[in-house]
């Protein structure tokens, strides 16, 4: 998504975008928004490149729901290099970047035995260990807003494409009717 597109859809002026979203002087309003983190640095620091969640929003079925749940499912795990793990994406390399807002939570598991006698850990829920700077309701609202933005940023023209699609289908239906009538006219002498 481009800075200009965000400004247009959010009703922001060019100066508001430059002052609040563009953090380098060399950027122009028509350029794409990209991560400021170098993928090589991310691989060195976290063991893997950080995922682009806007692509996840577009490619996964129910991508918005997945991102929302993912951002709320980090828990403390001392065995991981980042100190956290995730219920939705186990052993993820991404750190919990929103930990100051959400706080720390512990995942509670119970052990169940299946019909074959194999034991499995089953997630039961989270327990808050340390409060963040936001209440749970505020954090939920903020994550919902972030998720909605990422879903929109994954395909900014989606609403326009869908609106235009009805006109295209309507045109094709009319064209089909005209082609059918023309075919009947051409073939009436043969039948």
Regions of interest found by a model, annotated:
Residues 75, 151-154, 182, 186:
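Hydrophobic/aromatic-lined pockets within catalytic cores
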Residues 161-191:
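Juxtamembrane interface at the cytosolic side of transmembrane helices
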Residues 136-160, 164:
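Juxtamembrane amphipathic/hinge helix adjacent to a transmembrane helix
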Residues 128-130, 157, 184:
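C-terminal lobe and adjacent flexible extensions of AdoMet/dcAdoMet transferase-like proteins
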Residues 123-131, 135, 151, 162-174:
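C-terminal low-complexity, acidic/polar tails when present
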Residues 2-131, 140-144, 150:
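Extracytoplasmic electron-transfer domains, predominantly the class I c-type cytochrome c fold
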């Amino acid at each position: 998504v481009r800075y200009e597109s965000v400004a247009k859809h959010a009703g922001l002026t060019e100066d508001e975008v430059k002052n609040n979203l563009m953090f380098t002087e060399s950027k122009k309003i028509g350029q794409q928004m990209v991560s400021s983190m170098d993928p090589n640095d991310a691989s060195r620091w976290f063991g893997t490149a950080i995922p682009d969640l806007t692509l996840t929003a577009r490619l996964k079925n129910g991508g918005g729901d997945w991102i929302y749940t993912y951002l709320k499912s980090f828990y403390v795990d001392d065995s991981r290099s980042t100190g956290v793990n995730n219920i939705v994406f186990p052993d993820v390399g991404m750190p919990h970047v929103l930990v100051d807002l959400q706080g720390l939570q512990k995942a509670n598991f119970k052990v169940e035995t299946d019909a074959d006698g194999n034991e499995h850990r089953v997630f039961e829920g989270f327990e808050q260990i340390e409060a963040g700077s936001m209440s749970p309701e505020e954090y939920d609202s903020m994550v919902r807003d972030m998720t909605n933005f990422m879903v929109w940023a994954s395909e900014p023209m989606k609403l326009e494409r869908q609106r235009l699609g009805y006109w295209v289908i309507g045109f094709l239906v009319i064209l089909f009717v005209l082609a059918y009538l023309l075919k009947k006219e051409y073939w009436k002498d043969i039948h």
